[in-house]
């Protein structure tokens, strides 16, 4: 019986609103969960109080999402509410942690926004960008006193946990931070390295094609440095000559200075050689 009561309360909280004056709707709600007798009487008697509970829970959930993606919610305006309501009804959150709520909402909403002409195309990228900032901010930064280890071509490169490589179709990272802004982003393919600095700030580095390909190999594919260099050069249609190797070394040195690169990974491949990061500008 406890399970039936919990299911009824979940529907009341997350499903379509039932008016306290709609006796047939209340009766149908109780019948759906096979509640009768003293339980039905108690729930009916306390229905107005349960409606207040519904309002508080939904307000907390709405507020948690709005705090994470405020500019997205502001740009949607009143149109956000139907998406929020449908999320709670069709794919209610399974977690007790509010930090996991927005990723669940976006997993539900983004495919639907893609097919909704009333939602601006760039909004999915903006929502992902805002949510990513909160995610990265919650992860550990590099200790301030850490000294990056020398790199080796036959081994991979180790990054801090608070590092993400993302691709957008719109330059949403250049939009103003003000929630009231309605400036439109430029439509452009963008690759960003997002990381938490030793000063505990979330920072962004926009990458060119070669740098993006190199970091994709190192971060996403966990390739050895030599293999990642070869792959990145091919993808960027550039010769892997001394000039490109210098650009790569400068990029890796810059990432070490920024606090996102820790040094070589413990994974070893076949050939042995070494590449030491040197200071300079990123590729």
Kindly give the residue locations of the regions a language model identified:
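Long, charge-rich, low-complexity alpha-helical segments
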Residues: 1-149, 200, 205-283
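Low-complexity, glycine/alanine/valine/leucine- and proline-rich hydrophobic stretches
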Residues: 159-220
